[in-house]
Amino acid sequence: MQVLAVVPVQRLEQAKSRLAPALEPAARQALVRELAERTIRILRSVPAVAVIGLLTPDPSLASLASRWGVRTLRDAAHGLNDAVRLAQAEACRLHLPALLIVLGDLPLLDPHAIRHALALLESPGVVLAPDRHGTGTNLLALAPPDVIAPAFGPFSRWRHRRAAAGARCTIRELWSRALVLDLDTPEDLALVHRVREGER
């Protein structure tokens, strides 16, 4: 199943403000760019990903997207759910059977996790990867692209599950080490360092 894969990224000056106790603004912005570029490289290595879009209101990131060889879907900074609705419309316009949303702050992401998520996807269906707290959503795959409305935010895991039940479509959850950890707080940053140290 061919998909449009999108990576949502906030404006650089607003991104990762909760990391302020651990990182200066320039370091936070560099981290956001690095993670976004890494996510795009991983998506490009997955054959089922037909088109990649960077979902951002930030003009500087839009210029980087061009350099990275992906299209920019400019959202109007009204929030992640509005941005994902824009991506849903784009996937339908491209006549692609599925949409994949991968948050751009997953430092342990790998191609196998993406392939696994897409292998689980049925149509009509939803695949979601929860965060490490078991309440959020770090990856969401939808077939068809508009099978449910996006419900990112607090307790999004449960809201996406309810939406899938309401749509009477298959829902599968993927618990993956590569997908559970998103970088939001100094605690997350320390956890990533511990995981990487343990791999050496």
Curated annotation (Swiss-Prot):
Keywords, alphabetical: GTP-binding, Nucleotide-binding, Nucleotidyltransferase, Plasmid, Transferase
Sequence positions that bind phosphoenolpyruvate: T137, G153, S156
EC nos: 2.7.7.105
Keyword DNA-binding: no
Pathway assignment: Cofactor biosynthesis; coenzyme F420 biosynthesis
InterPro entries per the UniProt record, alphabetical: CofC (IPR002835), Nucleotide-diphossugar_trans (IPR029044)
GO MF, any single term: phospholactate guanylyltransferase activity
EC class name: transferase
Reactions it catalyzes: phosphoenolpyruvate + GTP + H(+) = enolpyruvoyl-2-diphospho-5'-guanosine + diphosphate
Gene3D superfamilies per UniProt: Spore Coat Polysaccharide Biosynthesis Protein SpsA, Chain A
Further information: The exact nature of the substrate is currently not known. This entry has been annotated based on its similarity to Actinobacteria.
Family per record: Belongs to the CofC family.
Protein purpose: Guanylyltransferase that catalyzes the activation of phosphoenolpyruvate (PEP) as enolpyruvoyl-2-diphospho-5'-guanosine, via the condensation of PEP with GTP. It is involved in the biosynthesis of coenzyme F420, a hydride carrier cofactor.
Name of this protein: Phosphoenolpyruvate guanylyltransferase
Organism: Thermomicrobium roseum (strain ATCC 27502 / DSM 5159 / P-2)
Gene this protein is translated from: fbiD
